[in-house]
Each structure stands twice: as structure tokens, then as C-alpha cells.
UniProtKB/Swiss-Prot annotation:
Pathway participation: Amino-acid biosynthesis; L-tryptophan biosynthesis; L-tryptophan from chorismate: step 4/5
NCBIfam families: PRK00278.2-4 (NF001377)
InterPro entries: Aldolase_TIM (IPR013785), Indole-3-glycerol_P_synth (IPR045186), Indole-3-glycerol_P_synth_dom (IPR013798), RibuloseP-bd_barrel (IPR011060)
Protein name: Indole-3-glycerol phosphate synthase
Gene3D superfamilies recorded: Aldolase class I (3.20.20.70)
UniProt entry tagged with the keyword Magnesium: no
Keywords: Amino-acid biosynthesis, Aromatic amino acid biosynthesis, Decarboxylase, Lyase, Tryptophan biosynthesis
Record-linked HAMAP family: IGPS_B
The reaction(s) this protein catalyses: 1-(2-carboxyphenylamino)-1-deoxy-D-ribulose 5-phosphate + H(+) = (1S,2R)-1-C-(indol-3-yl)glycerol 3-phosphate + CO2 + H2O
Species assigned in the record: Desulfotalea psychrophila (strain LSv54 / DSM 12343)
Length: 260
């Protein structure tokens, strides 16, 4: 793993230890509420004709720093929903991405779309936490989990009513993810070791993945031509965050990206 990924995972172990000590609880203003039933993240992507869009609410990242200074996750999510996207991704990592679990609750309550908890999952406690906070899906990163963990966490997430997006970056991780029985595979075009981006990563890995497993392309998607190529290659969905956050009106950006 890269230095930054090592640091993130080390911090997650600290967070899990604290979670184990303190228990899982909701913020006071949400304590009496219970999230609506799971909305079917995977099914939402599959039911859309053409390339589905997962729009991400992302305030910052380790590689790019602050992305959106005036960050309002509810306003962002409502705008995404009006634009016709199929799902929303919410960063919940606090220390490296300036995210917050509260954002997950707030977004889930504000929109009718399925919501992905985007974080670095290393323990089943985080799955319980994600479920309590209303996540319809969670991210499992093959670079930080072994095959057994990928399988066990996916199965446990399903017991809790959540889908799992298993993220890979290279062929070795893809083989591990497929062996774990994943049913929704994400290809991160950003190399977590050096944070370089290569959209061709998706097309290389597409050749390894059975057509019955939906594929999601993540990171570095900035041009309409990229989305057209993804659709032509049989990719199910594109996860787009920074491009939408940086380039003004999400509606205008998506209209440009979706143009024929």
C-alpha cells in the first residue's frame, strides 16, 4: 500500500477501536428516526437504460485538497436528484476527505435515491454503522481487504440490506474480487499508490469481468467521449465526483457529458 493509504488504514483501525469502546450511536437530532427501507443501489443502476450515473458529494481529497469550499451536501444531493442521476455517493471519511457520517444521514433523508457510503471499510462494525446511518450500499476496497474479508463483509452487508461495490485498480485485485463472489465491481481509474489517473484502467479490466457482473468506472471521467466509450464497452455506471463539484452547475456538466 502507499504511504497515504497506509495512513488512512491506520486511522481506520483507531476509529474502529473507538467505535468498539463507545458503541454505535446516531446524532441526537436523528436518534428517534429510523432510515427508510433499503432502496436497492445495484438495482437502481441496472434498471436504467444506458450508462447510469453515481454522482458524488465530495468536499476534499488527499491528492487535490479542498474541492468545494461552500459544501452543502443536502443542496448538492437534491441538485443531483433533479438532474436525473441514478444514485449518490457520500464521502464519510473525516480526516482525509473532510467527510462526515452526518452527511450520509442528511442526504438519505433529503432525497429518494439510493446512497453509497464511500469510506475505507476494514471491520464489520463499520457495516453496522453504515446500516444505522441509512446507507443503501457500502464500498469495499480490494487493496486493503483480503478475499475472505471481501466475501464475508459483502455477505454481512447483504444481511443488513445493503449492496457492496467492490473496488479494484488492477488485474490482481480484480481476480481477488471475482474469487470473493462480488456482484458489483468498481474500477478505480486512480492508482491509490501514487494517485495518478488512467481511464484506460477500466477498459483493461472490463475484458476480465463476466458480462453478468455490473461494472462501475470511477475517477478521472471528465469528457463526454469517456462516457460514450464506457457505454460502448458495456460498463454499467460511472461514478463522477470532482468533475461535478468543480465545474459549476451539475445539470450543465451532466448535460454536456451526456450529449450524443
Amino acid at each position: 500500500m502507499s504511504d497515504i493509504l497506509d495512513r488512512i488504514v491506520a486511522r481506520k483501525h483507531e476509529e474502529v477501536a473507538q467505535l468498539r469502546r463507545d458503541g454505535i450511536s446516531l446524532p441526537e437530532e436523528f436518534a428517534e428516526k429510523r432510515p427508510a427501507p433499503p432502496r436497492g443501489f445495484r438495482q437502481s443502476l441496472l434498471s436504467h437504460q444506458g450508462l447510469s450515473i453515481i454522482a458524488e458529494a465530495k468536499k476534499a481529497s488527499p491528492s487535490k485538497g479542498l474541492i468545494c469550499e461552500d459544501f452543502d451536501p443536502v443542496a448538492i444531493a437534491k441538485n443531483y436528484e433533479r438532474c436525473g442521476v441514478q444514485a449518490i455517493s457520500v464521502l464519510t471519511d473525516r480526516d482525509f476527505f473532510q467527510g462526515d457520517l452526518r452527511y450520509l444521514l442528511q442526504v438519505r433523508e433529503a432525497v429518494g435515491l439510493p446512497v453509497l457510503r464511500k469510506d475505507f471499510i476494514i471491520d464489520e462494525l463499520q457495516l453496522k454503522e453504515a446500516s444505522l446511518y441509512g446507507a443503501d450500499a457500502i464500498l469495499l476496497i480490494a487493496a486493503i481487504l483480503d478475499e475472505a474479508q471481501l466475501r464475508d463483509y459483502r455477505c454481512y452487508a447483504e444481511e443488513l440490506g445493503m449492496d457492496s461495490l467492490v473496488e479494484v485498480h488492477d488485474e490482481e485485485e480484480t481476480e481477488k474480487a471475482l474469487a470473493s463472489g462480488c456482484n458489483l465491481l468498481g474500477v478505480n481509474n486512480r492508482n491509490l499508490k501514487d494517485f495518478s489517473v488512467d481511464v484506460e484502467t477500466t477498459f483493461r479490466i472490463r475484458k476480465m469481468v463476466p458480462i453478468e457482473i455490473p461494472l462501475v468506472s470511477e475517477s478521472g471521467l471528465k469528457e463526454a467521449a469517456d462516457l460514450r466509450r464506457l457505454a460502448e464497452a458495456g460498463v454499467c455506471a460511472a461514478l463522477i465526483g470532482e468533475t461535478l463539484m468543480r465545474m459549476g452547475s451539475a445539470g450543465d456538466v451532466l448535460a454536456e457529458l451526456w450529449r450524443p
